[in-house]
Structure formats: C-alpha cells, structure tokens
Amino acid sequence: MLNRYPLWKYLMVFFAIITAALYALPNIYGEDPAIQVTGARGASVDMSTLDAVTTALDKEQLSHKSIALENGSILVRFNDTDTQISARDVISEALGKDTIVALNLAPSTPDWLEAIGASPLKLGLDLRGGVHFLMEVDMDAAMEKLVGQQEEAFRSELREAKIRYRAIRPSGKEAVEVLLRNEEQLAEAKAMLEKNHPDMLFVESDSNGRYALTATFTEQRLQEIRNYAVEQNITILRNRVNELGVAEPLVQRQGASRIVVELPGVQDTARAKEILGATATLEFREVDDKADLSAAANGRAPAGSEIKMDRDGRPVVLKKRVILGGQSITDASSSVDEYGRPQVNISLDSEGGNKMSAFSKKNIGKLMATVFAEYKDSGRRTPEGKVILDKHEEVINQATIQSALGRNFRITGIDSAAEAHNLALLLRAGALIAPISIVEERTIGPSMGQQNIDMGIQACIWGMVAVMLFTLLYYRGFGLIANIALMANLVLIIGVMSMIPGATMTLPGIAGIVLTVGMAVDANVLIFERIREELRDGRSPQQAIHQGYANAFSTIADANITTLITAIILFAVGTGAVKGFAVTLSIGILTSMFTAIIGTRCIVNLIYGGKRVDKLSI
C-alpha cells in the first residue's frame, strides 16, 4: 500500500526529536555567575578548603546562591557579576597560591537533566565577551638561543676530547663555525662531533691555512625545533592562563608559528596582556672575577665572557656559560627578607638542583650573578610585517656562594613587591622557549556579546517567520507540514550541538543556523513541486505523493552532499570563526535532510496514507 511507513520509522523520528529536545532544553535555563576553585600544580581541594572559602565569604558579607565540592573542585554560585568579582579577590587572598581561583559561568540546569548528561552550549568569545590574542613565536630568537647552546656543547666536547680550537662562533642564523689549528685537528673534530650530533651536517673547509668546520641542522631537525618551540610555548601559555584564573580558555596553534589565545569573560585585559606576552626569565651565571674592570668599562671582555649591566648601569663581566636557566625552576613565590626587601623564593627540579649543587660546591667563595632577561617590542617590523623584538638583559643580583646550594634558595635585588610577585608568577608558569609578540588583540565586552546573541536570535526568528509564512501561503496544508519540520530541524541542530563535547556556539555558528533555516525549506520546495507536477500529469494524489518524494530524493541528496563537502573543507582549513560556521552548517545539512525527507513524509503518511484522497492541500 502506498504512503505507509512501518512503525519503527515513526518511533525513530519521534525518539530522535524527543532526545534532541531534551539535550537542547538546558539552553533555556541560562547560567549563574560563579567561581571555580581548583588545586594548583597537582594540589587538591577538600572540605577544609570549602570551609575556608565559606568563612572568607561570610566575613566579607558576600552572599552566594550555593557552594559545593564537585569532581575535585569547589563551585560557588552568585546572584550577580559584581559580587562574583569581589568574591574572587577575597577567596584568592584567603587561599593563597596553592589554588587557582577562576571566574566562571555555571549552568542552571536542573538535576534531572544533568543526570542524563545534558548541558547548555558553550558560548564563544564573540557571544560571551572576553579577549582574543593572536601571538607569533619569534623563530629567529629560538634559533639564536639554540645556536648558542650548540656553541657551548661544542666547546665542552672539544675540551673533553683535548682537541684544541681557535674559536667557536655562530655562522648566520642556523649554523655554528668551529675554527681549528691544523688539518689533523679538523679531521678529529669532525669525526667526534658527527658521532655526537647525528642530527647535524658538518662541512669542512681548508683554504689559505684556515681550517674551519661549519655545522648546520638537518631540515628534519629544523622542523622539529620549530614545532617544539611552538608546542612548548602553548603549554607554558596554558600554565600562565591558569595562573590568571580563567575558566574554559582556548589556547591553540594557528599555522606554522602563531598561537591563538581566547579568554572568555576576562575583564582585566591589561593584566592578561602583561602576563601572557611577558618573556621574562632568569639565568644564573658565574661572575668572571679575573676580568679587567677598566677594560670592561670600555666594552672589552676576555674570551668566553661577556659584559652585562646591573640596574645601576655598572658593567659586570659574566662567563658565557649558563649554570641554570628558567626551565629548571619548578616553583617560585614572592616574599620579603628580614630587612623587609622583596625577594623570590626558588625551587628547582632534581636535575637543576644537582647542577646547582655541583657548581656551588666547586665555587665556594666566588660570585654568582642572577640575570633578568626579557624581550620587548622594539617598535620596528620586518619587510614581511613581523614584529622585531629587542632582548634586554640586566644583572639584578650578585651573591657570594657561602656554601653548597641545594634545590631551594632565594634571589634578591628586586625593585618592588609587585615586580617580585609578577616574576614569581612567570617563573611558576615556565619560561617561554622562544619570545612571542602579540600581533592582534581584540576585546569584546559582555554587553557586546549579549547584543550579538540578541541580534543572532532575532535574525533566526525573523528568518523562520518569513520562510514559514511563504510556505504556508504558497503550499497551504503541505506548507504547514514543512513548517513543523522546520521547527523540528532547529531543535535537532541545537540538541545535536549540545551533545557534542567541547562544541561552542559562535556568531558565525548562528549565521550557519540562519542559513540552514532557508536551505531546509529547499528540499520541501523540490518535493512539493514534484508532487504538483505528478498531479498535473494526471496521477492520483497517493501516486503523486509517492512519486514526488521518490523523484526528488536524488536531486536533494546531490545538492546537500556537495554543500556538505564544502563545509567539511571549510572546517579542515579554516580558523576558529570559520570552523564554527562549518560545524553548524554540516549539522544543519544532515538534520534538514532528515526532517525534510523522513520527517515530513511521516506526517504526510499519517494524514494521507491508506486513505481515499480526492484532493491535496498543496
């Protein structure tokens, strides 16, 4: 019999729409301003932490809707954002540096919906408000640092092998040149270094009594270095974001050397920019106490040493070899010494502790300097438009090694408590592998985000109203069926997106929904026009319905599959905003095919199937 579906098809459509509606429902309930408290660096929060938070809020008379310990973190809900911001400062002061206190928005989803895993869609930066940074990793500086490390490695290895050399110096941006005394030493050095460094290419040259060995990295190794610089910087930026206390941040790679950082809900954008863009780190160097100070004042330093200035502008001669860098620091905190001066307490990892212990044992009575290094925007750009960074280094502390140092010690010579606090924060989060510059900054206020939501919803509503009026007036009864399918399609899109872990609704995503609303009716228009053609050809209403759906299917499938391929390509090659549009469009294409072909057919079959029909309302 024509136009009859088996029972399972009706049940499939019914349960699909009901399931989507349940998962879309949490988006109606909205969100509460909240604070999330989690442990820092592996620490955990427990009931004692919960009591401390409650006590701190009660002491300052800050009211809250609820407070609970859930999944290893404390969630405090508030009635308004003003109380939320005040409470963040109070809780941070009460708990100290062992916790991360983050502003958040907690969904007001009922427990029965949470029990089935239903949660509202996450809103992107353009809808929620916040700050967007596009950062570029300075690969030239990364290579300069690596070449310097290779110079030191070559010096140590040649000394250990007792091969005498004239000089070791950089050659260009990505190579090291070793000058030897004779041909025999050149051959020995090449054999030894090739064995120790299989990822480098060594080319020897012998002209006019100049014996040189030029070492360059293989192309594969260069690519690994570049990838490592970007990936490590991403990890460190994530640590810094955690220190800032931002919930649900986005830190991801874009292209070969760029990183996107999005911080939803951040109000203090200047502070975020200061911490994320900072390139400060520490180096511990041995002071060359045998150097001629008068020569140093004129800018001359002995071989193996270099001149750095202290904060008073006086020259200090330091050995080029770095005892320890910021990468060995596992923890740092700011405090004051017995004289009330700011200081930073440093803890090293086991390898760094062993290096510091071994060095200090051999150099008791000698001076060790703490060098503060930072890259700053020079205001200049390359012909390609890249920001040129200048490296600023200064000696902030010189101390005599009184005894063997271990994994924990302190540094002084810092100007202010605020500087000590910032330096400790950066050292805790980790030193950047290569300096970064902010090439794009965009701030979206919460009111602008809400305006985007309101305008997006209005566009969706008016788009649906216009389409529904047209189909209702032009196709009458069948137009009403198409309108029911259109509303079901919208529920399916929101429901499916709410089910996808990590899916984010953005303004381009809303544009994708509005576009899908128009596209969803296309399939119904094709079907209804085919039914009209079949009726004009003299077929009965039942045959016209059957042939209309059957003949229109291939056209609908072809059109939607080609659009789906385009959406997949957009997702594969696009950035954040384009990806959001592509995801929504892809889901919309699939759901519109489902509702237009199967959904409307179910309704049509229920109304007309198995009955004698003389006329169709189309």
Swiss-Prot record:
A Pfam family assignment: SecD_SecF_C
Compartment(s): Cell membrane
Source domain of life:
Bacteria
Which GO cellular component does the record give, naming just one?
plasma membrane
By sequence similarity, the record places it as follows: Belongs to the SecD/SecF family. SecD subfamily.
Keyword terms of this UniProt record: Cell membrane, Membrane, Protein transport, Translocation, Transmembrane, Transmembrane helix, Transport
Fetch the NCBIfam families from UniProt. 2A0604s01, secD
Q: What is the effect of changing R240M?
A: Nearly abolishes protein translocation
Q: Carries keyword Protein transport?
A: yes
What do we know about how this protein assembles, alone or with others?
Forms a complex with SecF. Part of the essential Sec protein translocation apparatus which comprises SecA, SecYEG and auxiliary proteins SecDF-YajC and YidC.
- One GO MF term attached to the UniProt entry: protein-transporting ATPase activity
Annotated protein name in UniProt: Protein translocase subunit SecD
Q: Where are the transmembrane segments?
A: 10-30, 455-475, 477-497, 508-528, 563-583, 587-607
GO annotation, biological process: intracellular protein transmembrane transport; protein targeting; protein transport by the Sec complex
Described function: Part of the Sec protein translocase complex. Interacts with the SecYEG preprotein conducting channel. SecDF uses the proton motive force (PMF) to complete protein translocation after the ATP-dependent function of SecA.
Q: Does the record carry Nuclease as a key word? A: no
Provenance organism: Vibrio alginolyticus
Which SUPFAM superfamilies does the UniProt record give?
Multidrug efflux transporter AcrB transmembrane domain
InterPro entries xrefs: Acrflvin-R (IPR001036), SecD (IPR005791), SecD-TM (IPR027398), SecD/SecF_arch_bac (IPR022813), SecD/SecF_CS (IPR022646), SecD_1st (IPR048631), SecD_SecF_C (IPR048634), SecD_SecF_C_bact (IPR055344)
Q: How does it sit in the membrane?
A: Multi-pass membrane protein
